[in-house]
């Protein structure tokens, strides 16, 4: 196997490019119905999910999805102590391809955060990244990528070889949009 068929990232950000408050809480101002429908619709076709210890996608299917849980608390890889379908993975100790092979799935990998996880996959290489924007303000929060807010999330994606492939309005009343980013 070696790599997923595709690596897709999903994030909704505030005006400042934040995905959560400083204390790692995703506020209600980012939990918008239209974006949640888009997000869970995308996850429906994913073979597995990648997330950090403090984040997950929620929803009724979350517990059943195979997943890579990125952590620095182990040297390489280990079975998740509470989830037989999950693998703890330290990117500093093991290549992504080895972790993916050990997960024993094939298909799309959906990356759902948090900031360090989104940043790690910038280097591994997203095939697609769906960046939703909400008009919420979260000053001094947790950024979607390293380097935000000094740079915009869009600038970070561009610096990693991604190009905008169009923006869709998810909900005009709440001013929520999603931009699809793909390889240049």
Language-model segment annotations:
Residues 1-184:
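Enzymes that bind and transform nitrogen-containing heteroaromatic metabolites
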């Amino acid at each position: 196997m070696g790599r997923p068929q595709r690596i897709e990232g999903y994030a909704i950000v505030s005006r400042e490019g934040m995905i959560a408050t400083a204390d790692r809480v995703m506020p209600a101002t980012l939990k918008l119905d239209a974006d949640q429908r888009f997000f869970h619709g995308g996850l429906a076709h994913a073979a597995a999910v990648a997330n950090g210890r403090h984040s997950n996608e929620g929803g009724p299917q979350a517990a059943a999805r195979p997943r890579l849980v990125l952590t620095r608390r182990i040297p390489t890889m280990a079975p998740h102590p509470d989830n037989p379908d999950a693998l703890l993975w330290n990117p500093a100790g093991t290549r992504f391809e080895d972790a993916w092979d050990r997960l024993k799935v094939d298909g799309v990998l959906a990356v759902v955060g948090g900031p360090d996880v989104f940043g790690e996959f910038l280097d591994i290489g997203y095939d697609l990244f769906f960046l939703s924007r909400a008009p919420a303000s979260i000053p001094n929060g947790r950024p979607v990528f390293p380097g935000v807010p000094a740079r915009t999330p869009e600038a970070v994606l561009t610096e990693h070889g991604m190009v905008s492939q169009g923006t869709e309005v998810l909900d005009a009343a709440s001013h929520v949009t999603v931009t699809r980013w793909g390889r240049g």
